[in-house]
């Protein structure tokens, strides 16, 4: 009838034909069975034998669904299974079993019939959105709210509603959309995740290029409220790379910034020479500008006339000089202090001796056993000595030889009867006046007045007189020859 075509479910005529087709063989089988029984038991039992056969009643087919098997006689042990069409779900048991009850009759277990009810629409999975209701039935509208920075967009711009269909599906399902992922340059990178496809309003991204490439365009892009970027994505253009810098004999170069894998635009090279060599020019830098080195000149290192010590050696030499100078100064100060201490101790044991002071008013003293002893001045010593000699002696002071005036005694040695002074007497006078031993006799203990005795009686009279003359002579420094204290014998 349908010429090999599969009719749709729910066709009443087809279901009726399906129910009638399986029943004919079963009835034919029942008739054959009845005739066999009639042959065995006789014609008297033909009527009651067919009526004794028992079967379960037809369980029926649920609306908007179907059953397997769809028709026939359900004897004891038969099973009926139930299914629903799309958009519906089964409410009840999926299968029923024909069994005999305790009273001996047959029935379906479970006894409740299964039905097909309309299915609810499932909650859709929408990224960057929040769905308010948890269940939606046929004909209900979908209610969602997009996250901050995202806006709702429908496939059908003329229909801004999404409804739940009777088959449990949604029509015109919306999405929450932001700015779409911008293109990235193959020679650069952007600060976004590779899995992120949509960006909320206000998002700012930036682009960077790999070394050797220059950014052409805006480095920063912002997602605007109309869900487009503030500008087109930039490009990374290749820069012209400078060749290898010129080589320097007895030197080398370093580049800034380091390391220099490629001499890109803006790279700076600094030249330097080996120890003992120096650059011929004060300028030691060249810069890569659009594939060329600027300034373009050859760098040379020449041998230095004077080799300057290294910084370490210079510091070491400086510290040596400072240490030597400080040590010398400390040593000189120590020697000065020791000399001063020695001079102080020497003066305490040996008072200084020198010419008499010009001023007679300044007193001199020495310290003897911790007790200061006043010394006579030069004038006092001279006046005291002259007063002790007497008036007769003063007349002969101006002459070269001091002789007593009152006493004209003969000489102390025989054969000398001449009263005149000879050459020998003059020499004796000079030797006596210059002898330092005569000065010591001035401070010897006083003796008895022997001036009245004649000079011839005592040979020491001449020496004593000479001593007195020497004490009055201005050419003799009495103060230097006077002992400060008497030494023990």
UniProtKB/Swiss-Prot annotation:
Show which residues sit on the Cytoplasmic side of the membrane.
340-489
Transmembrane region(s):
319-339
Give one Pfam family, short name only. Answer: Sushi
- Residues on Extracellular side: 41-318
Q: Kindly state one GO CC term assigned in the UniProt record.
A: membrane
Intrachain disulfide bonds: 56-98, 84-116, 121-164, 146-176, 179-223, 209-236, 242-288, 273-301
**The protein's name in its UniProt record:** Sushi domain-containing protein 4
Residue span of region Disordered: 1-20, 400-489
Could you tell me which InterPro entries the record lists for this protein?
Answer: SUSD4, Sushi/SCR/CCP_sf, Sushi_SCR_CCP_dom
Topology versus the membrane: Single-pass type I membrane protein
Lineage of source species: Eukaryota, Metazoa, Chordata, Craniata, Vertebrata
Function in brief: Acts as a complement inhibitor by disrupting the formation of the classical C3 convertase. Isoform 3 inhibits the classical complement pathway, while membrane-bound isoform 1 inhibits deposition of C3b via both the classical and alternative complement pathways.
The biased composition feature labelled Polar residues covers: 449-474
Locations of Acidic residues compositional bias? 478-489
Q: Where in the cell is it found?
A: Membrane
Which keywords accompany this UniProt record? Disulfide bond, Glycoprotein, Membrane, Repeat, Signal, Sushi, Transmembrane, Transmembrane helix
Chief subcellular site? membrane
| SMART domains assigned | CCP
Q: What Gene Ontology terms for biological process does this UniProt record contain?
A: negative regulation of complement activation, alternative pathway; negative regulation of complement activation, classical pathway
Q: Where does the secretion signal sit in this chain?
A: 1-40
**Sushi domain span:** 54-118, 119-178, 177-238, 240-303
Give yes or no: UniProt keyword Repeat: yes
Gene3D superfamilies, alphabetized: Complement Module, domain 1
This chain is glycosylated at 103, 133, 191
